[in-house]
Amino acid sequence: MIDHTFHPRPLELAKLLLTHGFSVTRIYLDAVNPEEKATFEWLKQQYPGLSYEPTIHPEMRMRPRKEENVLAIGQKAAWFTGTKHFVNLVEGAGLYGFDGIRKVAGLMIEAWQEEKDPEDLIIRKGWGCESCI
């Protein structure tokens, strides 16, 4: 699971992960960035089972959050799935290029091995506290 708050180009991230053997089943995003339109079309053709979920629809807040054994990349993906295994970064956190990919891979391993409490971290973020990230 990937969400659009994790990185400015979530579809490119999904493509990178999928083409390197990772399982990506859902992307949370509200619109397709024009810069990612070709990637979106490629994903639709190559991975027709990939689902796209909006984050701004009110009914998303009421959905059951019971997907505990998944790795979420981004806070919204963590919130909507209910998993405690998530990478807690926003807007790429300045990670760029090969070194950024390498660091994200390390954060993915860490997120799978060490649980976090999404309700504590994400709700604190919503209150505007500085210590959430």
PLM regions with names:
Residues M1-I133:
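An N-terminal assembly and electron-transfer interface module characteristic of large anaerobic redox
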